Amino acid sequence: MSRKPLIAGNWKMNLNHFEAIALVQKIAFALPDKYYDKVDVTVLPPFTDLRSVQTLVDGDKLRLSYGAQDLSQHDSGAYTGDISGAFLAKLGCTFVVVGHSERRTYHNEDDALVAAKAATALKHELTPIICIGEHLEVREAGNHVIHCEEQLRGSLAGLSAEQIGKVVIAYEPVWAIGTGRVASASDAQEVCAAIRKELASLASAQIADSVRVLYGGSVNAKNVGELIAQDDIDGGLVGGASLDGEQFATLAAIAAGGPLP
């Protein structure tokens, strides 16, 4: 099955709503509409930027989509500081990240919570980008594939085969995030292939073949082409490079097979 590449820009805790508008405008200007037939492009701003991004995307009829970096497993109630999936859906979000390594590390989120958040996202017709990945000591011990398979199973626990078919998986080796280090294309492919095999055992081969698996970890315009040329890598969860409108647009164009005539 041919899977359309997805380039997702995770802005993390960067850019106020004015800066968000400027960045989306830069991306829109630098990436002509014809590329969107070949690649899906989404930005993942902080919550406080979402309404501004929505207004710009809707008003200018831009073809890029947008989403959020997290959501609550609860729909509403006395959960101070949490953000409901219903709120995100009302703002027109398409995607939501769950289980990013920074959430797992700094907020002690475990696989069970990630699975609950993924289920909540799906309930609100949001596409969860479920993140998994190993720390350096796990890779150096040679246990990275087993670790990622176990984390995947835990993060999908309770989801039906049909629901699994609606998620995106992002493999993000923790040791490569924001460090400038990047897994080699063959190293990334090894884990992404194992992820797809595990998806087949959890759902079906047909569903596994349809799910997009992204690589995240110091993705930039220089390495994205080699990464997505791998059989089981369908795009990138992009961090720092997504804050540079020109580089992000270039990266997306490469993922589309560009430059296009």
From Swiss-Prot:
Keywords: Cytoplasm, Gluconeogenesis, Glycolysis, Isomerase. The keyword Isomerase applies. The active site is at H100 (electrophile), E172 (proton acceptor). Pfam families: TIM. It is found in: Cytoplasm. It comes from the Bacteria. Its EC number is 5.3.1.1. It is an enzyme of class 5 (isomerase). GO terms for cellular component: cytosol. Pathway: Carbohydrate biosynthesis; gluconeogenesis; Carbohydrate degradation; glycolysis; D-glyceraldehyde 3-phosphate from glycerone phosphate: step 1/1. It catalyses: D-glyceraldehyde 3-phosphate = dihydroxyacetone phosphate. GO terms for biological process: gluconeogenesis; glyceraldehyde-3-phosphate biosynthetic process; glycerol catabolic process; glycolytic process. CDD domains: TIM (cd00311). Involved in the gluconeogenesis. Catalyzes stereospecifically the conversion of dihydroxyacetone phosphate (DHAP) to D-glyceraldehyde-3-phosphate (G3P). Belongs to the triosephosphate isomerase family. Homodimer. This is Triosephosphate isomerase. It comes from Mycolicibacterium paratuberculosis (strain ATCC BAA-968 / K-10) (Mycobacterium paratuberculosis).
